[in-house]
């Protein structure tokens, strides 16, 4: 005999929310689904280019490979100088 009450609740009209707007409804085990990208704003379907920056990874890449602005290069030099000072103080101990 199967166990009773082990299945999750089913919401046949679950709302899919993207950027604060309800974009579609679907069936799900959660009443609301929050998404960053859906077919209505995905670059493949819209034909536009959009950079999806997750946790500053694009900025870090730009700084690392010198594709950023002059301010980013100056910030990188400051960070390198701080790291060198930390290395020098740890070697003296």
UniProtKB/Swiss-Prot annotation:
One of its GO terms (cellular component) is ribonucleoprotein complex. Pfam families: Ribosomal_L31 (PF01197). One of its GO terms (biological process) is translation. It comes from the Bacteria. Residues 68-93 are annotated as: Disordered. Coiled coil: none annotated. One of its GO terms (molecular function) is rRNA binding. InterPro entries: Ribosomal_bL28/bL31-like_sf, Ribosomal_bL31, Ribosomal_bL31_A, Ribosomal_bL31_sf. SUPFAM superfamilies: L28p-like. Keywords: Ribonucleoprotein, Ribosomal protein, RNA-binding, rRNA-binding. Belongs to the bacterial ribosomal protein bL31 family. Type A subfamily. NCBIfam families: L31 (TIGR00105), PRK00528.1 (NF001809). Binds the 23S rRNA. This is Large ribosomal subunit protein bL31.
């Amino acid at each position: 005999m199967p166990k009773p009450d082990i299945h999750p609740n089913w919401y046949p009209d679950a709302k899919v929310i993207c950027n604060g707007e309800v974009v579609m409804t679907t069936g799900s085990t959660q009443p609301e689904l929050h998404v960053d990208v859906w077919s209505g704003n995905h670059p493949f379907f819209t034909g536009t280019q959009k950079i999806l920056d997750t946790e500053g990874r694009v900025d870090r890449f730009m700084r690392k490979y010198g594709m950023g602005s002059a301010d980013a290069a100056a910030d990188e030099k400051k960070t390198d100088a701080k790291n060198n000072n930390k290395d020098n103080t740890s070697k003296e101990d």
